UniProtKB/Swiss-Prot annotation:
Binding-site positions, 1-deoxy-D-xylulose 5-phosphate: K128, S154, E155, S179, H200, S213, N218, K219, E222
Organism of this sequence: Symbiobacterium thermophilum (strain DSM 24528 / JCM 14929 / IAM 14863 / T)
Any Pfam family matching the protein: DXPR_C
Gene3D superfamilies in the record: 1.10.1740.10, NAD(P)-binding Rossmann-like Domain
Entry-linked InterPro entries: DXP_reductoisomerase, DXP_reductoisomerase_C, DXP_reductoisomerase_N, DXPR_C, DXPR_C_sf, NAD(P)-bd_dom_sf
Recorded family membership: Belongs to the DXR family.
GO molecular function: 1-deoxy-D-xylulose-5-phosphate reductoisomerase activity; manganese ion binding; NADPH binding
Record bears the keyword RNA-binding: no
Essential cofactor(s): Mg(2+); Mn(2+)
Biological process (GO), any one: isopentenyl diphosphate biosynthetic process, methylerythritol 4-phosphate pathway involved in terpenoid biosynthetic process
Protein name, per record: 1-deoxy-D-xylulose 5-phosphate reductoisomerase
Function: Catalyzes the NADPH-dependent rearrangement and reduction of 1-deoxy-D-xylulose-5-phosphate (DXP) to 2-C-methyl-D-erythritol 4-phosphate (MEP).
Length: 387
Protein backbone atom coordinates (compact mmCIF):
# COMPACT_ATOMS: atom_id res chain seq x y z
CA UNK A 1 0.00 0.00 0.00
CA UNK A 2 1.28 3.47 -0.88
CA UNK A 3 2.08 5.78 2.03
CA UNK A 4 -0.21 8.83 2.12
CA UNK A 5 1.78 12.08 2.34
CA UNK A 6 0.61 15.59 3.22
CA UNK A 7 3.06 18.44 2.56
CA UNK A 8 2.75 21.77 4.35
CA UNK A 9 4.77 24.32 2.41
CA UNK A 10 4.78 22.45 -0.89
CA UNK A 11 5.89 25.39 -3.07
CA UNK A 12 8.96 26.21 -0.98
CA UNK A 13 12.47 24.78 -1.32
CA UNK A 14 11.89 21.71 0.88
CA UNK A 15 8.39 21.07 -0.46
CA UNK A 16 9.44 21.10 -4.11
CA UNK A 17 12.39 18.80 -3.39
CA UNK A 18 10.11 16.44 -1.45
CA UNK A 19 7.82 16.20 -4.47
CA UNK A 20 10.87 15.41 -6.60
CA UNK A 21 11.70 12.54 -4.22
CA UNK A 22 8.10 11.31 -4.45
CA UNK A 23 8.27 11.56 -8.25
CA UNK A 24 11.28 9.23 -8.21
CA UNK A 25 9.35 6.62 -6.17
CA UNK A 26 5.92 6.48 -7.86
CA UNK A 27 4.99 3.11 -6.42
CA UNK A 28 5.71 4.04 -2.82
CA UNK A 29 3.91 7.33 -2.05
CA UNK A 30 0.58 9.02 -2.68
CA UNK A 31 0.20 12.78 -2.17
CA UNK A 32 -3.13 13.41 -0.40
CA UNK A 33 -2.81 17.09 0.61
CA UNK A 34 -0.69 20.09 -0.37
CA UNK A 35 -0.61 23.40 1.51
CA UNK A 36 1.10 26.54 0.27
CA UNK A 37 0.92 30.30 0.65
CA UNK A 38 0.26 32.51 -2.34
CA UNK A 39 2.29 30.84 -5.09
CA UNK A 40 -0.90 29.55 -6.70
CA UNK A 41 0.56 28.94 -10.17
CA UNK A 42 3.23 26.62 -8.79
CA UNK A 43 0.70 24.93 -6.52
CA UNK A 44 -1.62 24.40 -9.49
CA UNK A 45 1.22 22.72 -11.40
CA UNK A 46 1.92 20.45 -8.42
CA UNK A 47 -1.76 19.64 -8.03
CA UNK A 48 -2.13 18.67 -11.68
CA UNK A 49 0.94 16.42 -11.42
CA UNK A 50 0.11 14.68 -8.11
CA UNK A 51 -3.70 15.15 -7.90
CA UNK A 52 -4.12 15.43 -4.11
CA UNK A 53 -7.62 15.43 -2.65
CA UNK A 54 -7.06 18.65 -0.67
CA UNK A 55 -5.26 21.91 -1.45
CA UNK A 56 -4.80 24.78 1.00
CA UNK A 57 -3.59 28.33 0.42
CA UNK A 58 -3.04 31.49 2.45
CA UNK A 59 -6.39 33.24 2.03
CA UNK A 60 -9.68 33.41 0.13
CA UNK A 61 -8.18 35.49 -2.71
CA UNK A 62 -5.46 32.90 -3.32
CA UNK A 63 -8.11 30.16 -3.15
CA UNK A 64 -10.18 31.90 -5.83
CA UNK A 65 -7.13 32.31 -8.07
CA UNK A 66 -6.20 28.65 -7.61
CA UNK A 67 -9.74 27.51 -8.36
CA UNK A 68 -9.77 29.54 -11.58
CA UNK A 69 -6.46 28.04 -12.72
CA UNK A 70 -7.64 24.50 -12.07
CA UNK A 71 -11.01 25.03 -13.76
CA UNK A 72 -9.15 26.03 -16.92
CA UNK A 73 -6.75 23.08 -16.95
CA UNK A 74 -7.78 20.25 -14.63
CA UNK A 75 -10.44 18.44 -16.64
CA UNK A 76 -12.36 16.15 -14.29
CA UNK A 77 -9.92 16.72 -11.38
CA UNK A 78 -11.80 18.66 -8.67
CA UNK A 79 -9.83 18.87 -5.42
CA UNK A 80 -11.20 20.45 -2.28
CA UNK A 81 -9.67 23.91 -1.77
CA UNK A 82 -9.27 25.38 1.72
CA UNK A 83 -7.42 28.42 3.04
CA UNK A 84 -6.00 30.16 6.08
CA UNK A 85 -5.27 28.64 9.47
CA UNK A 86 -8.19 26.22 9.15
CA UNK A 87 -7.00 25.04 5.75
CA UNK A 88 -3.48 24.42 7.02
CA UNK A 89 -4.81 22.36 9.92
CA UNK A 90 -7.13 20.40 7.62
CA UNK A 91 -4.17 19.55 5.39
CA UNK A 92 -2.15 18.51 8.46
CA UNK A 93 -4.90 16.19 9.68
CA UNK A 94 -6.12 14.73 6.37
CA UNK A 95 -7.52 11.27 7.16
CA UNK A 96 -5.66 9.57 4.29
CA UNK A 97 -2.18 10.73 5.30
CA UNK A 98 0.19 8.64 7.36
CA UNK A 99 3.03 11.16 7.31
CA UNK A 100 2.96 14.96 7.35
CA UNK A 101 5.96 16.88 6.04
CA UNK A 102 5.96 20.26 7.79
CA UNK A 103 8.08 22.65 5.74
CA UNK A 104 6.28 25.96 6.26
CA UNK A 105 8.57 28.78 7.37
CA UNK A 106 8.48 30.13 10.90
CA UNK A 107 6.33 29.71 13.99
CA UNK A 108 3.17 29.30 11.89
CA UNK A 109 4.12 25.62 11.81
CA UNK A 110 3.38 25.09 15.52
CA UNK A 111 -0.42 24.71 15.41
CA UNK A 112 -0.65 22.42 12.36
CA UNK A 113 2.18 20.25 13.68
CA UNK A 114 0.43 19.81 17.03
CA UNK A 115 -2.85 19.12 15.21
CA UNK A 116 -1.18 16.46 13.05
CA UNK A 117 0.34 14.81 16.12
CA UNK A 118 -3.02 14.81 17.88
CA UNK A 119 -4.48 13.12 14.78
CA UNK A 120 -1.84 10.38 15.09
CA UNK A 121 0.30 11.38 12.09
CA UNK A 122 4.02 10.78 11.97
CA UNK A 123 5.88 14.05 11.36
CA UNK A 124 8.73 14.70 8.93
CA UNK A 125 9.92 17.92 10.52
CA UNK A 126 11.58 20.51 8.30
CA UNK A 127 10.18 23.45 10.27
CA UNK A 128 12.77 23.86 13.03
CA UNK A 129 10.96 26.92 14.41
CA UNK A 130 8.19 24.64 15.68
CA UNK A 131 10.57 22.92 18.10
CA UNK A 132 12.33 26.17 18.96
CA UNK A 133 9.07 27.87 19.94
CA UNK A 134 7.18 24.90 21.40
CA UNK A 135 9.66 22.05 21.81
CA UNK A 136 8.38 20.87 25.17
CA UNK A 137 4.75 20.79 23.99
CA UNK A 138 5.54 19.09 20.68
CA UNK A 139 7.81 16.37 22.07
CA UNK A 140 5.41 15.62 24.93
CA UNK A 141 2.48 15.38 22.52
CA UNK A 142 4.41 13.08 20.18
CA UNK A 143 5.37 10.80 23.05
CA UNK A 144 1.79 10.73 24.38
CA UNK A 145 0.34 9.87 20.95
CA UNK A 146 3.12 7.44 20.03
CA UNK A 147 4.01 9.23 16.79
CA UNK A 148 7.47 9.61 15.27
CA UNK A 149 9.26 12.94 14.89
CA UNK A 150 11.56 12.40 11.90
CA UNK A 151 14.05 15.23 11.32
CA UNK A 152 14.50 16.59 7.80
CA UNK A 153 17.25 19.12 8.48
CA UNK A 154 20.43 17.48 7.17
CA UNK A 155 22.19 17.92 10.53
CA UNK A 156 19.41 16.41 12.62
CA UNK A 157 18.90 13.60 10.13
CA UNK A 158 22.62 12.87 10.52
CA UNK A 159 22.31 12.83 14.32
CA UNK A 160 19.19 10.65 14.14
CA UNK A 161 21.03 8.14 11.95
CA UNK A 162 24.17 8.26 14.11
CA UNK A 163 22.10 7.52 17.22
CA UNK A 164 20.39 4.47 15.69
CA UNK A 165 20.18 1.74 18.33
CA UNK A 166 22.24 3.70 20.87
CA UNK A 167 21.41 4.13 24.54
CA UNK A 168 20.60 7.86 24.98
CA UNK A 169 22.55 7.81 28.23
CA UNK A 170 25.72 6.88 26.36
CA UNK A 171 25.90 10.21 24.47
CA UNK A 172 28.75 12.47 25.52
CA UNK A 173 28.33 15.21 22.90
CA UNK A 174 26.37 16.06 19.80
CA UNK A 175 28.65 17.64 17.21
CA UNK A 176 26.48 19.92 15.09
CA UNK A 177 28.25 21.04 11.94
CA UNK A 178 27.88 24.42 10.22
CA UNK A 179 29.23 25.59 6.86
CA UNK A 180 30.10 28.93 8.43
CA UNK A 181 28.01 30.76 5.84
CA UNK A 182 29.22 33.29 3.26
CA UNK A 183 31.03 35.44 5.85
CA UNK A 184 33.14 32.76 7.57
CA UNK A 185 36.42 34.32 8.69
CA UNK A 186 35.16 37.86 8.26
CA UNK A 187 35.49 40.03 11.38
CA UNK A 188 33.67 43.15 10.20
CA UNK A 189 30.10 42.67 8.98
CA UNK A 190 29.43 46.38 8.50
CA UNK A 191 28.01 47.10 5.08
CA UNK A 192 26.99 43.53 4.20
CA UNK A 193 24.45 43.72 1.39
CA UNK A 194 21.29 41.70 0.83
CA UNK A 195 22.85 40.10 -2.27
CA UNK A 196 26.00 39.05 -0.40
CA UNK A 197 24.00 37.54 2.47
CA UNK A 198 21.81 35.54 0.08
CA UNK A 199 24.85 33.93 -1.59
CA UNK A 200 25.33 30.71 0.41
CA UNK A 201 28.55 28.83 -0.45
CA UNK A 202 27.08 25.31 -0.27
CA UNK A 203 23.29 25.01 -0.08
CA UNK A 204 20.40 26.25 -2.21
CA UNK A 205 17.66 27.35 0.21
CA UNK A 206 14.88 29.85 0.71
CA UNK A 207 15.71 33.47 1.54
CA UNK A 208 14.91 33.29 5.26
CA UNK A 209 17.04 30.24 6.04
CA UNK A 210 19.86 31.58 3.83
CA UNK A 211 20.03 34.79 5.88
CA UNK A 212 19.84 32.70 9.07
CA UNK A 213 22.85 30.74 7.80
CA UNK A 214 24.74 33.98 7.19
CA UNK A 215 24.14 35.13 10.81
CA UNK A 216 24.62 31.58 12.22
CA UNK A 217 21.09 31.95 13.62
CA UNK A 218 20.16 28.85 11.64
CA UNK A 219 22.68 26.91 13.70
CA UNK A 220 21.45 28.56 16.90
CA UNK A 221 17.91 27.40 16.15
CA UNK A 222 19.25 23.95 15.26
CA UNK A 223 20.94 23.71 18.67
CA UNK A 224 17.54 24.22 20.32
CA UNK A 225 15.93 21.79 17.88
CA UNK A 226 18.53 19.13 18.74
CA UNK A 227 18.02 19.78 22.45
CA UNK A 228 14.33 18.87 22.16
CA UNK A 229 14.54 16.17 19.48
CA UNK A 230 17.21 14.13 21.23
CA UNK A 231 16.78 15.13 24.87
CA UNK A 232 20.38 16.32 25.16
CA UNK A 233 21.32 19.29 27.41
CA UNK A 234 22.56 22.39 25.59
CA UNK A 235 25.98 22.10 27.22
CA UNK A 236 26.43 18.76 25.41
CA UNK A 237 25.69 20.27 21.98
CA UNK A 238 28.79 21.69 20.29
CA UNK A 239 28.78 23.59 17.00
CA UNK A 240 31.74 22.94 14.70
CA UNK A 241 32.35 24.83 11.46
CA UNK A 242 32.91 22.43 8.55
CA UNK A 243 33.17 24.45 5.32
CA UNK A 244 32.78 21.50 2.94
CA UNK A 245 29.32 20.57 4.37
CA UNK A 246 29.97 16.87 3.72
CA UNK A 247 29.97 15.57 7.31
CA UNK A 248 26.47 16.63 8.27
CA UNK A 249 26.81 16.06 12.03
CA UNK A 250 28.12 13.47 14.46
CA UNK A 251 27.60 11.95 17.90
CA UNK A 252 30.42 11.32 20.38
CA UNK A 253 29.71 8.51 22.84
CA UNK A 254 30.95 7.96 26.37
CA UNK A 255 33.57 5.44 25.21
CA UNK A 256 35.20 8.02 22.94
CA UNK A 257 33.84 6.69 19.66
CA UNK A 258 32.35 9.20 17.21
CA UNK A 259 29.72 8.14 14.68
CA UNK A 260 29.04 10.56 11.83
CA UNK A 261 26.93 10.71 8.67
CA UNK A 262 28.45 11.94 5.42
CA UNK A 263 26.75 12.73 2.14
CA UNK A 264 26.44 15.18 -0.74
CA UNK A 265 25.02 18.65 -0.12
CA UNK A 266 21.61 17.69 -1.48
CA UNK A 267 18.52 18.07 0.71
CA UNK A 268 16.74 15.32 -1.19
CA UNK A 269 18.81 12.78 0.76
CA UNK A 270 17.51 13.64 4.27
CA UNK A 271 14.03 14.26 2.83
CA UNK A 272 14.01 10.79 1.27
CA UNK A 273 15.30 9.23 4.49
CA UNK A 274 12.41 10.76 6.46
CA UNK A 275 9.75 9.88 3.88
CA UNK A 276 10.90 6.26 3.54
CA UNK A 277 11.68 5.62 7.23
CA UNK A 278 12.11 3.00 8.65
CA UNK A 279 13.17 1.62 5.27
CA UNK A 280 15.90 3.00 3.04
CA UNK A 281 14.71 3.70 -0.50
CA UNK A 282 17.03 3.35 -3.47
CA UNK A 283 18.86 6.62 -4.03
CA UNK A 284 18.87 8.73 -7.18
CA UNK A 285 21.23 11.52 -6.06
CA UNK A 286 24.82 11.51 -7.37
CA UNK A 287 26.81 9.67 -4.66
CA UNK A 288 29.67 11.20 -2.73
CA UNK A 289 33.19 10.68 -4.11
CA UNK A 290 35.52 10.83 -1.11
CA UNK A 291 38.64 10.42 -3.26
CA UNK A 292 37.73 13.43 -5.38
CA UNK A 293 36.88 15.39 -2.24
CA UNK A 294 40.31 14.77 -0.75
CA UNK A 295 40.05 16.48 2.64
CA UNK A 296 37.60 17.61 5.31
CA UNK A 297 38.39 20.52 7.63
CA UNK A 298 36.91 21.72 10.91
CA UNK A 299 37.19 24.87 13.02
CA UNK A 300 35.54 26.66 15.92
CA UNK A 301 32.76 29.19 15.25
CA UNK A 302 33.47 32.89 15.85
CA UNK A 303 30.91 33.72 18.54
CA UNK A 304 32.14 37.29 18.92
CA UNK A 305 31.34 38.28 15.35
CA UNK A 306 28.32 35.93 15.19
CA UNK A 307 26.63 35.98 18.63
CA UNK A 308 23.58 33.92 17.60
CA UNK A 309 24.84 30.75 19.30
CA UNK A 310 25.06 32.63 22.60
CA UNK A 311 21.49 33.82 22.14
CA UNK A 312 20.31 30.21 21.77
CA UNK A 313 22.05 29.09 24.97
CA UNK A 314 20.63 32.08 26.82
CA UNK A 315 17.10 31.39 25.53
CA UNK A 316 17.14 27.75 26.68
CA UNK A 317 18.72 28.65 30.03
CA UNK A 318 15.98 31.23 30.69
CA UNK A 319 13.42 28.75 29.39
CA UNK A 320 9.68 29.12 29.09
CA UNK A 321 8.65 31.46 26.29
CA UNK A 322 12.13 32.88 25.68
CA UNK A 323 13.00 30.53 22.77
CA UNK A 324 9.73 31.51 21.08
CA UNK A 325 10.67 35.18 21.51
CA UNK A 326 14.16 34.56 20.10
CA UNK A 327 12.61 32.90 17.06
CA UNK A 328 9.91 35.53 16.46
CA UNK A 329 12.29 38.46 16.88
CA UNK A 330 14.70 36.88 14.42
CA UNK A 331 11.96 36.29 11.84
CA UNK A 332 11.02 39.97 11.91
CA UNK A 333 14.68 41.05 11.92
CA UNK A 334 15.34 39.01 8.78
CA UNK A 335 12.24 40.49 7.10
CA UNK A 336 13.40 44.00 7.97
CA UNK A 337 16.91 43.32 6.65
CA UNK A 338 15.59 41.86 3.38
CA UNK A 339 13.32 44.90 3.01
CA UNK A 340 16.31 47.23 3.43
CA UNK A 341 15.05 48.70 6.72
CA UNK A 342 18.00 47.63 8.90
CA UNK A 343 21.66 46.70 8.29
CA UNK A 344 22.91 43.12 8.51
CA UNK A 345 24.37 43.72 11.99
CA UNK A 346 21.00 45.14 13.00
CA UNK A 347 19.65 41.59 13.04
CA UNK A 348 21.82 40.84 16.09
CA UNK A 349 20.92 44.16 17.75
CA UNK A 350 17.22 43.64 17.26
CA UNK A 351 17.11 40.04 18.52
CA UNK A 352 19.17 40.84 21.63
CA UNK A 353 17.09 43.93 22.36
CA UNK A 354 13.77 42.08 22.20
CA UNK A 355 15.12 39.26 24.38
CA UNK A 356 16.32 41.82 26.94
CA UNK A 357 12.77 43.19 27.24
CA UNK A 358 11.03 39.83 27.69
CA UNK A 359 10.09 38.27 31.03
CA UNK A 360 9.55 34.62 30.09
CA UNK A 361 6.47 32.67 31.14
CA UNK A 362 7.57 29.32 32.55
CA UNK A 363 5.92 26.04 31.48
CA UNK A 364 3.75 27.84 28.92
CA UNK A 365 0.76 26.32 27.18
CA UNK A 366 0.14 26.90 23.47
CA UNK A 367 -1.80 30.12 24.12
CA UNK A 368 1.10 31.59 26.12
CA UNK A 369 3.60 30.61 23.42
CA UNK A 370 1.50 32.22 20.69
CA UNK A 371 1.02 35.35 22.83
CA UNK A 372 4.79 35.62 23.37
CA UNK A 373 5.33 35.15 19.64
CA UNK A 374 2.91 38.01 18.84
CA UNK A 375 4.48 40.26 21.49
CA UNK A 376 7.98 39.63 20.15
CA UNK A 377 6.95 40.36 16.57
CA UNK A 378 5.34 43.65 17.57
CA UNK A 379 8.39 44.58 19.66
CA UNK A 380 10.77 43.71 16.82
CA UNK A 381 8.80 45.75 14.28
CA UNK A 382 8.90 48.82 16.52
CA UNK A 383 12.44 48.59 17.88
CA UNK A 384 14.85 51.15 16.42
CA UNK A 385 18.20 49.86 15.17
CA UNK A 386 21.50 51.75 14.83
CA UNK A 387 22.28 52.19 11.14
Amino acid sequence: MKKGIAILGSTGSIGTQALDVIDHHPGRFRVVALAAGRQVERLAEQALRFRPALLSVADADAAAALRALLLAEAGDYRPEIAWGREGLIRAATHPESGLVLTSVVGAMGVEPTLAAIEAGKDIALANKETLVAAGELVTAAAQARGVKLLPVDSEHSAIFQSLAGADPGSVRRILLTASGGPFRGRKDLTGVTREEALRHPRWTMGAKVTIDSATLMNKALEMIEAHWLFGVPMEQIEVIVHPQSILHSAVEFCDGNIIAQLGPTDMRLPIQYALCYPERCRGFVEPLDLIALGALTFERPDEETFPSLRYARRAVTMGGTMPAVLNAANEVAVQRFLAGEIPFTGIFQLVAGVMDRHDPVQRPDLAAILAADRWARDAAREQPVRM
